[in-house]
A protein has these predicted regions:
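Short, Gly/Pro- and small/polar-rich lid/capping loops
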Residues: 1-9
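M16 family metallopeptidases and their MPP-like homologs
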Residues: 13-15, 21-41, 58-114, 137, ...
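Active-site SXXK
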Residues: 42-49
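Short, polar/flexible loop-turn hinges at active-site or ligand-entry regions and domain interfaces
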Residues: 51-54, 96-99, 118-127
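Acidic/histidine-enriched alpha-helical segments
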Residues: 62, 118-142, 229-239
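A common structural junction motif
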Residues: 110-121, 219-229
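An aromatic/glycine/proline-enriched structural segment found at the starts
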Residues: 167, 171-177, 192-250
Length: 250
């Protein structure tokens, strides 16, 4: 896979993957994890996945994806060491398999860029109704974590081991902070992400011309943003300490 720098803090990785019948366009936003914004960043992908400016609700978005032969849009977040990684990804069949010769890759590009750079806003902020719904979903996920003892123990061990260091930030969010999140707060962390994140554009299953068109479309979006990418935090090693045994009861 070829990886090239296409703008400050922006890389393109591509592979034509000619043996497969599907393609994928993924936009990764990577930035240092911070304790004060961890819960907002955990909620952000849940709200972004519900739709964007041209498809402001899940019904319209589902219909649009269905017309593209069952394409799939996902917006998720995952830890990346001491950094946070939010990914917007669209997957679907290649143009060559479209029954009527539709330019599917161009449509996938519009959806990916729409979800990443043109969210559905109400009075300049994320839709309050969508934020309220996804706050409940995030709360439920955090409350249910304790019922999965293996995952809970892994997360707790990670928090105890790394403590207050950047690697110890609970990137899935903090239950006690969810209720306090507002659409304005979520919009602020979203805009900060656009300004400061390192961006990885991953294009799989597209030819050179399609890849160039996707690259140019992304660069056009970034040209409208006053970008100042932050350096990512390197993986860290904690000092050796004596073993500690922790017991929790409920």
């Amino acid at each position: 896979m070829e990886r090239t720098l296409i703008a400050p803090g922006v890389h393109l990785s591509c592979d034509p993957a000619s043996k497969f019948n599907r393609c994928r366009i993924s936009i990764h936003f990577a930035f240092p994890a911070q304790r004060k914004t961890a819960t907002a960043h955990a909620l952000l992908p849940l709200v972004m996945e519900r739709g964007y400016a041209d498809c402001p609700d899940m019904t319209r978005l589902t219909k649009k994806l269905a017309k593209l032969y069952g394409a799939d849009l996902t917006v998720d977040a995952r830890p990346m060491g001491c950094n946070h990684n939010l990914c917007v990804s669209v997957t679907g069949i290649k143009d060559a398999f479209a029954l009527e010769g539709e330019a599917l890759t161009a449509e996938y590009t519009k959806i990916a860029l729409g979800a990443a750079f043109h969210p559905y806003l109400v009075d300049g902020c994320f839709d309050p109704q969508a934020v309220s719904i996804e706050k409940q979903m995030l709360k439920k996920g955090l409350e249910d974590e304790i019922n999965d003892k293996r995952i809970y123990c892994l997360h707790q061990a990670n928090r105890e081991f790394f403590g207050d260091s950047p690697a110890g930030v609970r990137q899935e969010g903090y239950l006690e902070e969810v209720d306090g999140l507002t659409p304005a707060m979520l919009t602020d962390v979203y805009r900060q992400m656009l300004r400061t994140a390192n961006i990885e554009l991953l294009v799989l299953g597209c030819d050179a011309a399609q890849t160039a068109a996707i690259r140019d479309a992304l660069l056009a979006e970034l040209a409208r943003i006053d970008r100042a990418p932050l350096p990512l935090v390197e993986n860290m090693a904690m000092p050796a300490i004596a073993p500690v045994h922790k017991t929790e009861t409920y």
